[in-house]
Amino acid sequence: MLEDALARIEDDPGALVTAWENGDEEWLARQLFGPLEGNPEFEEFYEAIFFRRNEAMTDQLADLVRDGRRRFVVLGAAHMLAERGIPALLRTRGFRVERVSGR
């Protein structure tokens, strides 16, 4: 299942970029996190690679901005998605997070 998802991404890597540019976070989440649904054997992998890292990076970012200065942060797309993504985690801590488009 995970290999199938990766193969789809490899077949058309531009689709990920296009989806990100268009703000299609639902499509991205389906592509990146779809293998997790109905496959408990992937849960620990996703916990380690994405969700625990998101928590740790959120802690670091919260500390980084305590001085009140604006920051520009770049992260991989998968860390930006869904309710366990870094923007959502920062919002739960009272931060204002906005998506910036290069277009």
Residue ranges and their predicted role:
Residues 68-70:
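Short coil/turn segments at beta-strand junctions that form active-site/ligand-binding loops
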Residues 1-66, 85:
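Hydrophobic, often amphipathic alpha-helical segments used for membrane interaction and targeting
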Residues 72-103:
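C-terminal structured interaction module
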